């Protein structure tokens, strides 16, 4: 998440949950009470959250037409979404408990034996939550960005799909499913 305030830019990698509400919904998150994002809160007007989907390096050798002509260069294919809105900090123990439970559930639900907060000492969890401050970002603007070699020929895109589907690097197979031959 990128925040600008008091002439400084603050960039943080934070776990966020999408929550229904307003036109585009809201993003819910939390930081420690000593975190710069919270300390600079009053000077921050808007924030931008960036969600990156699968992305991958594209070898020039994978382009059929370019390989023949020798007129090719490496590329990068990607899909991303930017969500922008106003941030509001929430100092509420009940909200924080519900938020942390929802965040944990979103990460644990697909596990064979998911962990839940009922397995932890309630006093310990309360002490952890007390050191955190919640926030919500009311999403006012969404912007999707993609580059999937759409300017290439159908033969080139089909070749990319085949190569990416066999590429062991993270995200390559998922990206192959997004490219339209």
Where are these regions (language model features)?
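Binding-site signature for planar aromatic cofactors or substrates
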Residues: 1-181
